[in-house]
Amino acid sequence: QFGLRRDSDGIAFTVGAAVALNSTLTAEISGGLQHRSYVDRTLQDINAPVINAALVWSVSPLTTVRFNQQTGVIETAVPGSSGAFTDAATLEVQHDLLRNLSITLGGAYLATNYDGVRIRERGYSATARFDYRFNRWLALRGSYIYSTLNSTIPLSTYEAHTVLLGVRVNP
């Protein structure tokens, strides 16, 4: 057999709370610790904090602002690395133009640091989206996403423009 055996066992402990700060503002926060150990002993065990936060502000009955922040560990196939530590934050503003038409504008930031190797990635994205609801369970969604990733790996930095159009079914 060639390569590393990346099978792993992991556990995470988190505690958190949700609070209604007032009639228009709610917050959630949680924190804890994650541990992961690998079958292949050449991969180091990973211990990392896990922190999540969310803030939802109902500016008006038609407009909502959402902020989310998350940290964690993700799997990777990068040689010499047990995993990657991530930190992600998103901010979205959603506005209902009509009873069945909403638009959303948002932005995101992603930082990834690989354990055991000198690879660092920083990414940013901007999103514009519309949702047209035909009824309670059927909607048309269109999105434009601009994303960029800056990496310390040569030739891994990129920019992308993505346009999506689809039908959503929520039974």
Predicted regions and their residues:
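Acidic, glycine-rich loop-and-beta core segments that form the ion-binding/anion-interacting portion
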Residues: 1-58
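Outer-membrane beta-barrel "beta-signal"
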Residues: 130-133, 137-139, 159-171
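Extracellular loop and loop/strand-boundary signature of outer-membrane beta-barrel proteins
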Residues: 1-4, 37-41, 50-52, 75-79, ...
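Residue-level signature of outer-membrane beta-barrel architecture
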Residues: 19, 57, 95, 132, ...
